[in-house]
Amino acid sequence: MTAAHKLTYGQRAARFTNPAAKALLETMERKKSNLSVSVDVVKSADLLAIVDTVGPYICLIKTHVDVVEDFDSSLVTKLQALAEKHDFLIFEDRKFADIGNTVALQYSSGVHKIASWSHITNAHPVPGPSIISGLASVGQPLGRGLLLLAEMSTKGSLATGAYTEAAVQMARENRGFVIGFIAQRRMDGIGAPPGVNVEDEDFLVLTPGVGLDVKGDGMGQQYRTPKQVVQEDGCDVIIVGRGIYGKDPSKVEEIRRQAERYQAAGWAAYIERVNALV
């Protein structure tokens, strides 16, 4: 069977049973975009303004609603309206990291009620398989998808080696809900026990630390280009934040220009990858 990264996003959509994964891949194919914009701002108005500006160019918006100082339920309603308007999915970057019962409550309840509106979320595999079963008990009936943090883009990250292998094996055992990884390269086949057939494995790989202009941010973040991430390392979605919206969310035209620029670069890298493997 053809390896996942040799297929188009549209072809891969047909291989997934998880609704969130299927919807994301179909959106990527339809919009010709593998760009996710990470919006880390503290005011609702700024978040919504940035999302409305980048919406036409993205497949996925990544949020951290716990940093929004004036959060209320109306923000979620407005964010969902923008997702409908611009045809993208929502990924709340919650990075759950507790026991199953606790994460189930964090996912379903509290102020943010993440499962009710976020198509995709993520978790650290540190607690073991119970974190997946806890989140799945809430998210799977709603058609949500989970990403595991198998690798990180920060200097000195401990998510390497046996840790990464264990994360992939946990995903392999929970394919109905775990749709892929936050990682820096393809994870298909990594850490597979002897005798396990991994030829048809297909995990989505979403990759932060993507930049066209800088190599780092002075706080440990390391950047690679879309060509390196998508074409060379086979990742699926590039995650870009400050490289698009900078420090001033009011600069709408510059934000739009950067979003269009990253969309084009990410898609070109994907086309090169697929064409090179035909």
Swiss-Prot record:
It comes from Schizophyllum commune (Split gill fungus). Pathway: Pyrimidine metabolism; UMP biosynthesis via de novo pathway; UMP from orotate: step 2/2. This is Orotidine 5'-phosphate decarboxylase. Its EC number is 4.1.1.23. The active site is at residue 95. Signal peptide: none annotated. It catalyses: orotidine 5'-phosphate + H(+) = UMP + CO2. GO terms for biological process: 'de novo' pyrimidine nucleobase biosynthetic process; 'de novo' UMP biosynthetic process. Substrate binds at residues 40, 62-64, 93-102, 223, 242. It comes from the Eukaryota. Belongs to the OMP decarboxylase family. The keyword Lyase applies. Pfam families: OMPdecase. GO terms for molecular function: orotate phosphoribosyltransferase activity; orotidine-5'-phosphate decarboxylase activity. Keywords: Decarboxylase, Lyase, Pyrimidine biosynthesis. SMART domains: OMPdecase. The keyword Lyase applies.
